[in-house]
Every structure is written in structure tokens, then in C-alpha cells.
């Protein structure tokens, strides 16, 4: 079908999009670090098959599908809406696939993935950002406002108003006393995004 197993090669486990995305994320990271196009050439067919598999899994969207869950920002003191995360991950998958297709000279596929990324990004910002305050919200419209939601939005590039999202990340970090309110996915990028937003002292604290 194209789905990647959470445990390879034996199969099993669980995780969904937040684990399966590693197939795309890691291939691009290896290419960026070493510049070896053969990495992308070797794994592109599998990544393309995975993206085809994801087409009917309900993203972008706000309906929970077991095929794309169940894991989010695991072990975080503050829970971030799963659908907010899953849609953000899907955006980054599409965005990276457009870059990978471009690097491989597959122009038509590059444009297809670019269009998908634009569609997901529009949906994410309309669904998970409150228009008045610019704070993040859950799929049901209630307030989310977690460090992870802002850090992911910045790191993955899904936020349209990066300045406003960055300000909320800094505000939230200060509001919880410069403690870590993130889990598996938010922690590694938290200080990076604070620093990127010019809040170096906040990151140190």
C-alpha cells in the first residue's frame, strides 16, 4: 500500500504519520548534509508510494483516522491537539517531497507536491490559528496555546504569520517560567525556534 512500518523490517508497533514521516525527513536531511543525490534517487519511489497511500487518509482535515495516529507530542506536560500536529506533519511531508522532486528534475511531480503543500498550509492556518489573537487552537476551535504548537508551526514552515507565531512562542515560554512544556516533537526544536525569533536569553533560561 505504501505505508511504512513503525518497526522495520519485522513490522508492528504504532505511531502513524509522526513516525512514518521519518522516511521523507531523513532522506532530505541526508541529502542536505552530504549532497549525495543518490540517496534521493534510491528512496524516492518508496516515498512517492507513501504519499499516494496518504491521499485518502483525511488530511488536510479534522477527522480522526486511526491510520494517521495515534501519537502526538508524547510525554509533554501540556498536550497539543493531535490534528494540529498531524496536519503540520503532512504539510512538511508535501513540502519536502516538492523539494526532493525538484532536486531530481521531476518538475511535474514537484508542482503537484507544491500544490498539495499550499493546500495543507492554507487549511492549517484557517483551522488552527485564531484570527483575532493569532494563538493556536484545537480542531474544535478551543484554545491550544502550547509551546509545541508554536515551535512546530515555525520549524515546519506551516505558519503563515511567522512573526506573530514567534511572539506567542516567546510569550508562552515566559508565561510558564521558562520551563519545558513540550514532548517528543516539540522539545528538540524549542530552543532553536526561540533563538530564531531573537529570544536567545529566553532559550538560555
Task: Give each language-model segment a name.
Residues 1-205:
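Active-site core of glycosidic bond-cleaving carbohydrate-active enzymes
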Amino acid at each position: 500500500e505504501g505505508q511504512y512500518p513503525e518497526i522495520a523490517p519485522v513490522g508492528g508497533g504504532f505511531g502513524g504519520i509522526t513516525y512514518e514521516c521519518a522516511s521523507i525527513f531523513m532522506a532530505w536531511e541526508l541529502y542536505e548534509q552530504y549532497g549525495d543525490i543518490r540517496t534521493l534517487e534510491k528512496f524516492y519511489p518508496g516515498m512517492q508510494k507513501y504519499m499516494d497511500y496518504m491521499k485518502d487518509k483525511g488530511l488536510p482535515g479534522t477527522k480522526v483516522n486511526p491510520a494517521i495516529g495515534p501519537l502526538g507530542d508524547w510525554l509533554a506536560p501540556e498536550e497539543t491537539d493531535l490534528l494540529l500536529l498531524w496536519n503540520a506533519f503532512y504539510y512538511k511531508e508535501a513540502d519536502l517531497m516538492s523539494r526532493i522532486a525538484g532536486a531530481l528534475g521531476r518538475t511535474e511531480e514537484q508542482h503537484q507536491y507544491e500544490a498539495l503543500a499550499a493546500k495543507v498550509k492554507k487549511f492549517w492556518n484557517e483551522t488552527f490559528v485564531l484570527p483575532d489573537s493569532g494563538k493556536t487552537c484545537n480542531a474544535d476551535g478551543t484554545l491550544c496555546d502550547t509551546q509545541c504548537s508554536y515551535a512546530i508551526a515555525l520549524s515546519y514552515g506551516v505558519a503563515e504569520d511567522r512573526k506573530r507565531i514567534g511572539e506567542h512562542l516567546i510569550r508562552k515560554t515566559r508565561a510558564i517560567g521558562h520551563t519545558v512544556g513540550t514532548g517528543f516533537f516539540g522539545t528538540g526544536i524549542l530552543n532553536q525556534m526561540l533563538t530564531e525569533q531573537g529570544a536567545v536569553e529566553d532559550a538560555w533560561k
